[in-house]
Amino acid sequence: MILAVGSPTGHVHSVITGMISYVAKGVQVADGQTRMLYTDFDGDGDRGVFLLNLSGQLIGWVTEQMEAEETAGASLAMPISEYKWMLEQLSNGVSIPYFGILGQDVSDSMLGDGIPRGVYITESIADGPAYSAGIQSGDILVRFGDQDISSLREFQGCMEETKSGDTVSVVIRRKSIDEYREIEYDVVIGAR
């Protein structure tokens, strides 16, 4: 059981109880992946709804209401544990580094189709640092600075060690007519 506090009913200082009905792993977010908590109550992220466990500890916040007919009355929440390092940075007056991609690990089936190991960029976010440097959707990120990248978690680890304003040399592999060719870009890390 969890408590939803803030304004889950639309009224300030309201509280309702509920459950986390499902935890989705590997949900794509800018520059990484996260877990997403599915709750069994109707809460709107625009209203300021926070989730507490029964010990009173903050465990997440509601981000959006699910609109699909089969999931009506449910909400999506972000678990606070996934954002601990960001919260520490922000509370110390340090901006969060921003590369500007959505990506996924190259799966075994993708490897079987000839896609090289790395992070498959599903979207190079418009006007983001990666996009501005020339990185495109469909590219495979294989090196970030001096670190070979074979998974999104490795990329996230590199980003946590990077500062806004740093220039990082990255290597991607891009599909040409019959092969993937390596291209190196210098990307100026942004802030968010």
Residue ranges of model-derived segments:
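PDZ-domain C-terminal substructure recognizer with occasional recognition of PDZ-binding tails
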Residues: E88-Y98, Q136, V142-F144, Q156-R192
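Conserved PDZ fold ligand-binding element
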Residues: I59, A130-L152
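Short glycine/Trp-rich loop-beta-loop segment that forms part of the substrate-binding cleft
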Residues: M1-V12
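Active-site region of chymotrypsin-like
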Residues: S14-G73, L111, R117-E123
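Short, surface-exposed secondary-structure boundary micro-motifs
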Residues: S7-P8, E64, D146-Q147, R173
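A short glycine-leucine-enriched loop at secondary-structure breakpoints
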Residues: G48-F50, G112-I115, P129-I140, E161-K163
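Generic structural signal for buried aliphatic residues
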Residues: M1-L3, L51, L141, V168
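C-terminal cap/linker of serine protease catalytic domains
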Residues: L54, L58-G114, T167, Y180
